[in-house]
Amino acid sequence: MKYDVITIPPDIYRFYLSNFTDDDLYSLSNNLRLNLNFNELKSIRDYFVNKLNRAVFDLELYSFSQLWSEHCRHKVFRGIIVDDNGNVIVDDILKSYIAKATEKCNKPWIVSFLKDNAGIIEFDDKYSIAVKVETHNHPSAIDPFGGAATGIGGVIRDILGVWASPIACIDVLCFGPLNYPYESIPKGLKHPKYLFRGVVKGIGFYGNNMGIPTVAGAICFDEGYVGNVVVYAGCIGILPTSTYRFSAKPRDKIVLMGNSTGRDGIHGASFASSDLKEDSERIARSAVQIPDPVEEEKLRRAIIRIRDENLASGITDLGGGGLAVAVTEMAGRINGGARVFLDSVHLREDLLPWEIWISESQERMLLIVPE
């Protein structure tokens, strides 16, 4: 037997990986849209068969899919780069170059970098500036308006995720030439002019509805971006330096706040880590989240008040991977675990447990509050 179904309801699938061949693992990954490579699939099988000696639940497989995605783990940046002869050029670009440059500065005004939702530097004796930038390329290639809007929404929440108040947006946008011949566009891709108009509207829609201006950025056009648009969204915020804190401890409570949870954004992190193909829109359209800046404005006001009244011991946003990633990261920061009651999550529609767990519905934040 390769799997069985536990009917609670809803239906929960268990997979007996000891009965799975290598080809079966590939089929499982494709059918569930896990986007895991063979080494990752094999390590999961070995762990559950040899160490835990039990079946793996569908929710656990989807958790690995999100937590081990390129979007969340930065496997390319953290990997070993070799030349044509197999000689190591660099081990972990993120650590060796990106992080090392800031570590080398070793300045006292660096409050936080590469360990929280946004980087923070001191502005003066009382306030600090928080900055976050992030790409939202794949979602924007499928739905330029929604992809760009949720890209801006995501970095605004990252700023809120370090207790800062967002004050300005920035962006870098890269498209193919606007006069690129229509007949030369590869199947499954959209024309640069359509992408350009949708992305610009999406960014303006989200920022304007929250009263946050886009104050700087850049735009470029090159044939190299016909195959994959670049939407590099950023946000800047300000916070009293003394309010930047993380004091969570075991037995604190997790609170999910903001928008209701729906089916939009499911597989978003793993989709962002895969290649764009001819059928990407048909398969992954639901991976693009639905933007709601009015709801995020409510979040902003609530979070700043929670900060000022010192009501929470920790905060993070729900971005790539949804609850699966946010809860895991928060629990990891205190070297602990968490018990999550999925039936308490406020839903927009009926969802399976694994869908609730990895949904990337926007305008949601996770708080940790003292018991």
Predicted feature locations:
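Repeat-solenoid scaffold signature
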Residues: 365-371
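Short, flexible, solvent-exposed loop/turn segments with mixed acidic/basic and small polar residues
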Residues: 352-363
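Short, surface-exposed beta-edge/turn micro-motifs
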Residues: 252, 362-365
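Short amphipathic beta-strand starts and helix->beta connectors
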Residues: 342-354
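Short catalytic-loop micro-motif centered on adjacent basic/acidic residues
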Residues: 313-316, 366
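A short, contiguous, amphipathic alpha-helix enriched in charged residues
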Residues: 331-343
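Core nucleic-acid recognition elements
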Residues: 1-277, 281-295, 303-310, 319-323, ...
